[in-house]
Amino acid sequence: MTLLEKNASKFEPNMLIFKQGNSELTNEAKKILDKFSAKLKVEQKSRMQLQAYAGEPNLSASRARRLSLSRALSARSYLIKNGIRSTRIDVRALGNKTSTGEPNRVDLKLIRN
């Protein structure tokens, strides 16, 4: 287990789940983001990486990537509204490039410097 994985595991769950075809944050997702934003406010040198996925039947690769980007940007916007500078948030839209786990998700990774 890497240092990053150890640090991320302290904030379980570290994944936002989305309804199929949707990029709207659920109340549960907002609660998770609230915990991460509180931690980022304390740890001013830490950064957040958002890795977004979208996997659905009959969804083309380009549409999956657009949907995953929309999900990542929803999470990013929520963090920014909670006082986290945009320069501390990295977004990766990976579309349907997942081999394990829930395909409709955003993984949250806290990166400590």
Language model features by range: what are they?
Residues 44-58:
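Short glycine-rich, basic-tinged beta-strand/loop micro-motifs
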Residues 30, 54-113:
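Periplasmic OmpA-like peptidoglycan-binding domain that tethers envelope proteins to the cell wall
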Residues 17-21, 39, 53, 63, ...:
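Broad hydrophobic/π-residue packing in well-ordered secondary structure
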Residues 1-47, 105-113:
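Periplasmic peptidoglycan-binding/tethering modules of Gram-negative envelope proteins
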